[in-house]
Design a protein with these regions (language model features):
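Autoinhibitory propeptides
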Residues: 6-73
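Sec/Tat-exported extracytoplasmic proteins
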Residues: 16, 42-45, 51, 114, ...
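Hydrophobic residues at beta-strand termini and immediately following loops
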Residues: 31, 50, 107-110, 154-156
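Short acidic, Gly/Pro-enriched loop/turn segments at secondary-structure junctions
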Residues: 57-62, 159-169
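Subtilisin-like serine protease catalytic core
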Residues: 73-106, 114-166, 180-184
Length: 184
């Protein structure tokens, strides 16, 4: 349907609903509505279905597991000029990610809406270190797979490691939008 998000957005507003975000590539609207409004929206042919937002959970990762990743840089493949999109619990500006230059280019906090990079869980920072840590804190003993890539992080998971599916889908859409500019 043409103008799907706009026509349904108007209906949601007329039912006194609150639109949280739109994911236009998938024709998804995330909104808070009363139960009666949900039943009314289901009557429109452009609404395929309505579901409750679900939580996803981060998978566990321990430091001993992460340290088992062995990297050989004999081929001189460091990831220079490549951007990596991360949807996780955030990223702490650790020395291995910021020295001698900061490789955390994008940080969007969908949980607390803070403007600076942080990680209140640790999973995201661990993931970023495995991917792009340069080993400056360990005299190059522990380096990531591609230590020169830039990081584009969306914090979609909270300190307990849970995040809404809608935030994850929104993050994916934003990273796809940014892909040409940052070579993600």
């Amino acid at each position: 349907y043409r103008n799907f998000p706009d026509s349904i957005s108007k209906k949601i507003h007329s039912y006194r609903g609150n639109i949280i975000r739109k994911i236009e590539s998938c024709n998804i609207i995330c909104a808070q509505l009363r139960a009666k409004s949900i039943h009314l929206l289901l009557e429109y042919p452009e609404v395929k279905y309505i579901c409750l937002d679900q939580y996803f959970f981060l998978c566990g990762m321990s430091i001993p597991t992460a340290n088992k990743v062995r990297i050989s840089h004999k081929l001189s493949l460091y990831g220079r000029g490549i951007g990596v999109g991360i949807i996780d619990s955030g990223v702490y500006p650790h020395r291995d990610l910021t020295y001698p230059f900061n490789r955390i280019i994008t940080f969007v906090d969908l949980i607390n809406e803070l403007p600076y990079p942080y990680d209140d869980n640790g999973h995201g920072t661990c993931t970023c270190g495995i991917i792009s840590g340069n080993g400056s804190s360990s005299n190059k003993i522990y380096t990531g797979v591609a230590p020169e890539v830039t990081i584009h992080c969306f914090k979609a998971f909270d300190k307990l490691g849970k995040g809404y599916v809608s935030d994850i889908l929104f993050s994916l859409e934003e990273l796809i939008t940014m892909s040409d500019k940052y070579n993600i």
